[in-house]
């Protein structure tokens, strides 16, 4: 058995034919780790005295067992175990319709697994390790909490587009001493000392970007309005060209979850990587500005301005610079 110390980056659950599977990605001094836990169960709790025999929810297969736990009012509870997370979700919806009280039915299996082991983010891992392409994988290892301060790798990402629904003209990323720009165009027509790689069309641009991101392999993706604009736009253009959006580690597909209701944010689900948005993080730290436009915030904090300000002519100026000053 091998031992590792890592820091939790992302967690996912997925229903399989063999039951619920939990996947955790960690950053460690030995490189990225992928922990897979198979044959797990989704769990919620119900009052011991509540019967289910005649309820429609009883048609969903679950195993009911008494446990040594009580509700907040001191009453005994039973645990309900489901082979798949979707079964618990369906059961919870039916129970609510029928006025049946459940406890902790909203806690996802991947979160409960960590909570029951008192793990927050740093953890010690012990198990049989297998080396994969760019990461180490452990199946059903032992885990426990530990003190660990990681040195996370990062890249800052920014794209420029031809309007609000046109092609991506350039993708730039930098971090930890690395700077790189991918741009549509012909190298023979443009002379520059900047670290630019020229690509013939948008599809080639996207494919090279995903290739380079996998090679640079950051733990964190940084940006301004990162999820709502850059990552969402990249996903849409990949879909347009039928290019797999493999921004996750191990070649896994990233997804930008769209809001279900007005005012909700988009959420980036990127296996093995964390997207950190500058706007969200400043707001979380209780910073307040007249405008959260990048140019305004940069001027307020750093005394610097963007080359292209957020004006009504911004798109026209981007197009002009792309034509004349690449």
Task: Tell where the protein language model's regions lie, with residue ranges.
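The two-metal-ion catalytic cores of nucleic-acid processing enzymes
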Residues: 1-280, 284-326
């Amino acid at each position: 058995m091998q031992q590792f110390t890592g820091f939790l980056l992302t967690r996912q659950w997925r229903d399989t034919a063999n039951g619920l599977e939990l996947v955790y990605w960690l950053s460690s001094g030995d490189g990225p780790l992928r922990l897979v836990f198979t044959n797990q169960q989704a769990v919620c709790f119900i009052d011991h005295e509540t019967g289910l025999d005649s309820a429609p929810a009883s048609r969903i297969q679950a195993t009911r067992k008494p446990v040594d736990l009580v509700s907040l009012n001191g009453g005994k509870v039973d645990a309900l175990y489901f082979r798949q997370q979707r079964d618990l979700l369906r059961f919870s919806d039916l129970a609510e319709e029928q006025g049946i009280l459940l406890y902790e039915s909203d806690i996802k299996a991947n979160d409960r697994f960590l909570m029951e082991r008192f793990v927050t983010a740093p953890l010690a891992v012990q198990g049989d390790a297998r080396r994969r392409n760019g990461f180490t994988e452990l199946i059903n290892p032992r885990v426990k909490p530990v003190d660990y301060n990681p040195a996370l790798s990062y890249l800052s990402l920014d794209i420029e587009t031809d309007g609000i629904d046109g092609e991506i003209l350039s993708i730039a990323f930098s971090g930890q001493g690395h700077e790189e720009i991918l741009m549509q165009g012909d190298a023979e027509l443009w002379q520059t000392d900047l670290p630019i790689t020229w690509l013939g069309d948008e599809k080639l641009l996207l494919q090279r970007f995903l290739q380079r991101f996998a090679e640079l392999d950051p733990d964190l993706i940084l940006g301004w309005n990162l999820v709502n604009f850059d990552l969402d736009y990249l996903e849409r253009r990949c879909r347009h060209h039928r290019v797999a959006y493999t921004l996750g580690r191990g070649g896994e597909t990233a997804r930008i979850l769209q809001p279900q209701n007005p005012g909700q944010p988009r959420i980036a689900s990127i296996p093995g990587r964390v997207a950190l948005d500058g706007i969200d993080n400043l707001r979380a730290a209780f910073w307040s500005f007249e405008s959260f436009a990048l140019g305004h915030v940069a001027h307020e904090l750093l005394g610097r301005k963007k080359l292209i300000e957020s004006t009504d002519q911004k798109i026209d100026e981007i197009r002009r610079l792309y034509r004349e000053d690449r």
